């Protein structure tokens, strides 16, 4: 049709310009184009879920300034409690019983498997990228079959609550097994393997992890300063 009009109408360019303007006028006055919700515009440009989308996910409870990536995977959200000022990055997996305090960052590709015993992250906790925290696991000794597709009669499931207390920092690529507690102020270096409770305000590294040195406790003073600041009041 276009080629025919080129032959029959030497002014075909003006014809197409007329068509273009007519379509623009029709689109401008259409109801669909006239009403675009503000939230929808914002959502399209955001990598995090909006307030209404967070509500639709079905968390048991969540606080203010909660940033959950649209690329994160959340399973059993009805078992999860999220405090204030939380960020969960791309490709994280959260499953089962999980309780997060406030001022928490869970970095990309990190996995938290809460099971029924649960994972608790208190306040000011950082879990770096590609970490795995398990409150439930299988017996790998060979005495039992293992993986989630095996009937429970043929498995030995190992469960234990995992707790990361205030100010805990976990370095990239680290693994934490069921039943472990990282006491207040513990720092775990990159690529560490944690299978037992770690003592407060100490730095550990390695696989299995070992004590390196005591950790500076200045974070406590900085927390107090933050909580007395205008930024803290605005975030509540």
Task: For each feature predicted by the language model, list its residue ranges.
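C-terminal segments of enzyme domains that contribute to small-molecule binding surfaces
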Residues: 2-45, 52, 145-178, 207-236
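N-terminal segments that cap or nucleate solenoid repeat domains
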Residues: 41-76
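Flexible, glycine/small-residue-enriched loop-and-beta-strand segment within the central core
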Residues: 72-82, 87-178, 207, 215-216
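C-terminal/domain-terminus segments
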Residues: 81, 86, 176-212, 217-226
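Short flexible/disordered coil segments
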Residues: 130-137, 189-196, 232-236
